[in-house]
Amino acid sequence: MKFFTKKSFAFLMVILMMFALVACGGEKKEETSATGTTNANGELVVGVTSFADTLEPTEQYFSWVITRYGVGENLVRFDENGELEPSLAEEWKVSDDKLTWEFKIRDGVKFSNGNPLTAEAVKSSLDRTFRKSKRADGFFKPTSIVADGQTLKISTEKPVAILPQCLADPLFLIIDTSDNVEEYTTNAPICTGPYVFKEFVPTEYAIVERNENYWGGKPGLAKVTFKCINDQSTRALSLKSGEIGVAYNLKIENKADFEGQDDINIQELKSLRSTYAFMNQHGALGDLALRQALLRALDKKAYTENLLGGAATPGKAPIPPTLDFGFDKLVDENAYNPESSKEILAKAGYKDVDGDGFVEKPDGSKLELNFVIYTSREELKVYAQAAQANLKDVGINVNLKTVSYETLLDMRDSRNFDLLIWNVLAANTGDPEKYLYENWDSSSASNQAGYKNEKVDELLDKLNVEFNPEKRKDLAIEIQQLIMNDAATVFFGYETTFLYSNKKVQNLKMFPMDYYWLTKDVTVTE
């Protein structure tokens, strides 16, 4: 048995700052950088979009907030290159029959309340996650989780090739369950990260403070405030004025807001994020011909190059071209072709009976598709409005419905949509397997669009147990081609992400898996 280690696999009462960036609490100063002297007790304000309405890590994707804000940690994590590395587990190995993974829990780690991190504590946390989360079984299903000293063993009925990578997803962050809290709301779970929650007001702000018990060295900031500013332009202006020091989810067009302002850093990364829309096959879009016609009406190249200024790659397949899973080999039978779209509609019996410019269904009833989008990402509205216009040109009537992210999740789960936009990491485990399973396996709790292809299910089962990288790649390519042939989903584009910050903020990094916003290394200078 070989051990795998590092690379194997609110508003606030006082938000406006008197200085160009952040409040500096305390007098102690340390290292000198190119931009000034590091403040050992510095404070930072970060502009974000509203995302979570509770701090319950098993609900929806709210664990991402806990991790992004520097509070939650996992057994393993991803580095800047998307490679797996140790975190709360120092090393891990798989048994010869590939049914049991063994993790050695790091010694000397404490939760923020001072309780020691033990294998038993990790087991209790993971047990809670599998008991409470609808998503957990989509990663893997343990037959047993056993703690022995500082060793944790996880067994499964079938081999799970990427089980360690699965445990890097924020859903599996480790909390201290000894507080016996069944459901966290604005009260925060006790974790091991460099920061702890001080205050959380949903849709307004969150405050985190330095974890004095942090095992990885002294965190670089005394306090960080995450301020919800959903409007993109307002977020940019807040950074420009110095009200905030970091702005997430700004776009390429915001560069113009900072022309001539040399105190701003702009980082960019071709991300693993994919923007797509589910097509609900429980309704009108259960008709393959209608889905094919819809896809062929969409000029996705124009959306990404003209409307988004080249800050995205046109969509075609489930997995972005930034991952080596056959993007260029895949054939898009439903590429942009509006004349073909009209022909498919006519042949399938969709005709404009009443002369209003929109086709009716073959039975003569009205065809109206409701397209649900959420508010916290500006580019989603751009895609949706452009798609609405393209579809009008071929006679398909689409109504846009803009809601909060939380409402969108409820509408997805209740199947209250025809089209529903989505923007996620296509490799949340560093590998696309779980992304493919979660969205297109017929048994997945997240597959509320009703897509079902028995061959896709079969290939996903094979992918789950296949350890050979080249065979995994071949399986993923075949799965993608089937999904595309079924006209299952609208793949709009794969974004380039941007991170805007004041130059006084040091050691702020972008990661392919965008789980890690606030790390212990982030500091501010005077």
Locate predicted features.
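Gly/Pro-rich hinge or "lid" segments in bacterial periplasmic/extracellular proteins
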Residues: D79-E83, A168-P219, K223, D231-S233, ...
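C-terminal motif of bacterial Sec signal peptides marking the signal peptidase cleavage site
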Residues: A20-A23
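Detector for C-terminal structural segments
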Residues: L298-D328, E379-Q388, R412-E526
